[in-house]
Amino acid sequence: MTDAAADDIAARRWPHATAPRRILAIRFQALGDTMITLPYLLGVRRRYPDAELHFLTREEVATVPKAMTQFDRVVALGGDRNRFRTWLSALRHTPALLARRYDVVLDLQNSRISNFVRRAIRPEAWSAFDRFSPRSAGERTRRTIAAAIGFDAGMDTALELRGGGPDIDALLLRYGWKAGFDLVVLNPAGFSPARAWPTASYIEFARLWIERHPRSQIVLLLMPSKRAKATEISIALGEHCIDLTGRADQLEAFAIVGRARFVLSEDSGLMHMAWTQGTPTLALFSDSRRDWSAPQGSWSDCLDSSDLPCGPCGLPVCKFGDNRCLTRYPAAQVLERAEKLARAHLA
């Protein structure tokens, strides 16, 4: 069968009525991009329960995939973000990947490295990620998978960790969780100043939420670089806040947002950890493109800047100096959207 475009995605479709024996999915971008693939690949696992499903990713984002029950094998490339070292790692792994004789390769990265690996291991069927169309990353992932296997595997958010995952109860209790209280995750983690909703707005949102839902506690799962912001929120909220900044690893953070009643987040990997598990998630976007990066599913929503002449700008610092695309949303309005999502999820 010759290479062909399948539904406008570069692909060679699986030609057999029987199921493939061994499938390799490739994704080694940032943490959030990797998280997005998980519910769609679980859809593949549900469709082909007897096939081996392997995942090729990078070491720095491999912790969660390695703990997932849906993968039979996870291969992690080294090299951090150094292109040369990543190439060397890919070259070292390619002979072993070739020896496994994959029937299908789902190249959900579509980079020079992933294209090299895909071509080198010579699968009978394959597809390459649509990198540029104005669709969400989740939708492009779904369509890329369908182009290779010939059907829509859908999205399944019932992601499972081996052995039930880490003991997050012990971690939460150690830092002030009141057993039985709902967890509400606030994540002011945008990597640039332009992505930041005001810290005072997060504090006001938290106070309003707790006033209406007193059996709730706020959880912070920020990186150490955001410690000053976390400290300000934690001091303001007192016993109502569980500050796990720098204290929870990737797997623990994944498990906590999976249990949370609600997540409010700027554009970040944690935001994608949340919606991909079916947790009600409200994203706050400023410079980010909603059509590419917004959370998916009826349990998610996104407040973004696409209705403004200046947005989404892609700039690290607001050219007006006031982050007006985010500051226009008062805490009470955000709370209203948040409660709507949380109520719909419970219903």
Language model regions located:
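Catalytic machinery of carbohydrate-active enzymes
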Residues: 1-347
